[in-house]
Amino acid sequence: MPNLASWHPQIVHFAIALLCVGVLFRWISLTGRAAFTGPAAAVLLLVGTGAAVLAVKSGTDAHGPVERVPGAREAVIEHEDWGKRTRNLFLAVAALEILALGLARRSARVAKGLTVASALVGLAGGFALYEAGEHGGELVYAYAGGVGIRYGDTTDVNRLLLAGLYHSAQQARTLHDSARAAELFGELARRFPDDTTVRFLAIESLIRDQNDGRAALAALARLSVPPDNQRLRLRYGFLKVDAFLAAGRPDSARATLEQLARDFPDVQRIKDRLAQIE
């Protein structure tokens, strides 16, 4: 069977949707209302179980690189174990559904009992499915499991590094650790020197984390933005204003804002900043 690692997210989400709706329909069918829910539940549960089998296969194919990340192994194993429990429970559900379909004409009473059993086991399967999803989410969001390595593209890995440095720097700033924030934004700028957004962040850090308006002005002088890009021009202009203020040059900051107001007369933020300086 081919390696399904890169397909794990898609397969998992199909399995979750099919199995959740399948269990819901099976319980509705037991009420005797909405006759279509009985056959629909059988189809959804059988197809969903197939998806669960493939989800475990794709997850097993994907777990190697994720498990080797320091500190992630236990989270990977826990997610994998819940995934296997989910698969096994729904294999039991699928077996009950197949038996119920096979006995429907011979013994309606037995078939009914089998569908009740399917509904009960389906509840247990639903709990296991929730746990597998919860631990899968923890693996991705708390350990970056699989993030940036899905296709083996170095560009994706670099994006992961960029995101990690950015969030670490922002967290340091939130914790009022200016020295750490400045260090991380500086590292970001060293690793991604050609990224305009990163250069803006590094200049902002000179102002906010180091209170070095002169260095920020020097960095801005080396940065050019497209004249037809309003968003970048505004960001450049506001950073220049902040840099002038940090350097103790409020008159230059006001002159910069006045020029921005002439260039972008409809931007309320410029007017608000002018009012603050005045």
Language-model regions, residue ranges each:
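Alpha-helical segment of the N-proximal tetratricopeptide repeat
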Residues: 136, 152-191
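Membrane-embedded alpha-helical segments of integral membrane proteins
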Residues: 1-18, 49-102
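Short coil turns that delineate tetratricopeptide repeat
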Residues: 159-160, 193, 228-231, 265
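TPR alpha-solenoid repeat register
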Residues: 198, 233-236, 270
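Structural motif corresponding to the intra-repeat A-B loop/turn of tetratricopeptide repeats
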Residues: 175, 209-210, 247
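Residue-level recognition of tetratricopeptide repeat
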Residues: 170, 204-208, 238, 242, ...
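Internal/C-terminal transmembrane anchor helices
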Residues: 45-50, 110-135
